[in-house]
């Protein structure tokens, strides 16, 4: 499956940024596999406590939220996604949590976060940074909705790795660690830690790949 045509690479890139149709469901499943370790690493950086309000940007089908609730069942989770298909899929697949009101998945435009100022304790996101239309403005939105002492955890694959992946030339904005740190600090966040890990994954093109990912934890103080 590794020898995809340019058109297939474009379609894959489009699905990764905005899953839709039958291929969108399949792409979400492949992302679960490819990003599982990365998602867990990001979640592990959240200081979780009872009644914490957690917002995730781009949860896809959201199958990983069970890991959050295993850490503490008394959390409030909101997942926002630009894909209507993913919002529907995540709501159905996580009915144990959505039916009880512990979790909710909502559609977003990817630019404005429809939440009150200082209403969220922690925000996390994995592999969405590349698709933000206006990254500085979006980070300002994240800063706005976070409470004081709020946590932001970003998981992404840095430019040095991403530029070797053929489909990332279609619609991906690539970042190195320093550029992300600078963006965060420009908005007013304080960087608490930056960690990197190298892993072997089954990529979205179906091949086994070695990749390095970065997790940055920042605070609103």
Region locations from a protein language model:
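Conserved alpha-helix/loop element of class I SAM-dependent methyltransferases that forms part
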Residues: 33-52
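Acceptor-substrate binding/catalytic loop of class I
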Residues: 164-179
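Conserved beta-strand signature within the Rossmann-like core of class I S-adenosyl-L-methionine
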Residues: 149-156
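Core SAM-dependent methyltransferase catalytic element
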Residues: 187, 200-221
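A short glycine-rich, Lys/Arg-flanked "PGG" loop and its adjoining helix->strand segment in the class I
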Residues: 136-148
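A short acidic, Gly/Pro-enriched loop at the edge of an enzyme's catalytic core
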Residues: 111-123
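Class I SAM-dependent methyltransferase SAM/SAH-binding core
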Residues: 53-112
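A short SAM/SAH-binding and catalytic strip from SAM-dependent methyltransferases
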Residues: 121-135
């Amino acid at each position: 499956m590794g020898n995809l045509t340019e058109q297939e690479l474009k379609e894959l890139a489009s699905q990764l940024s905005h899953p839709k149709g039958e291929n969108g469901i399949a792409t979400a499943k492949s992302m679960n596999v490819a990003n599982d370790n990365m998602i867990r690493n990001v979640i592990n950086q959240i200081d979780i406590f009872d009644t914490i309000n957690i917002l995730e940007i781009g949860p896809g089908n959201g199958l990983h939220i069970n890991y959050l609730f295993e850490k503490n069942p008394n959390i409030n989770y909101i997942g926002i996604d630009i894909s209507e298909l993913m919002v529907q899929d995540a709501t159905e697949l996580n009915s144990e949590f959505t039916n009880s009101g512990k979790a909710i998945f909502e559609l977003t435009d990817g630019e404005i976060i429809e939440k009150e100022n200082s209403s969220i304790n922690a925000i996390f996101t994995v592999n969405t940074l590349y698709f933000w239309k206006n990254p500085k403005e979006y980070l300002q939105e994240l800063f706005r909705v976070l409470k004081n002492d709020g946590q932001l955890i970003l998981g992404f694959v840095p430019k040095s790795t991403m530029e070797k992946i053929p489909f990332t030339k279609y619609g991906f904005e690539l970042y190195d660690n320093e550029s992300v740190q600078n963006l965060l600090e420009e908005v007013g966040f304080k960087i608490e830690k930056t960690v990197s890990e190298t892993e072997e994954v089954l990529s979205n093109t179906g091949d086994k790949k070695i990749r390095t990912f970065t997790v940055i934890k920042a605070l609103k103080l």
